[in-house]
Amino acid sequence: MPETVDPLDKLPDDIAAQAFRRLVRHLRKRHDAQNIDLMGLSGFCRNCLADWIRDAGYDGDKGDARALIHGMPMDEWKARFQTEATPEQLARMEASMKKN
């Protein structure tokens, strides 16, 4: 059986980088999109993006990576924008994570 190539792998890195930066900047502006809701819908959030850039070779530590993605230190972002997760949000996140 021939191995199939994911067309995404053919996307030039400069274009992929531009799209990634646009996504991050979009999420920086959309504070109403809570991480818990992103996790519940898609199985990833801003913190996951921070983990992924570290997995890809970013030299900063976890806090540096999260500050880069959030646009500010994580503690500041949490204090300014994060709301308390409801039991429903937590259940949705748990169900979503099982699909990853």
PLM regions and their residue ranges:
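Domain-level signature for proteins that mediate thiol-based redox and metal-cofactor handling
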Residues: 2-100
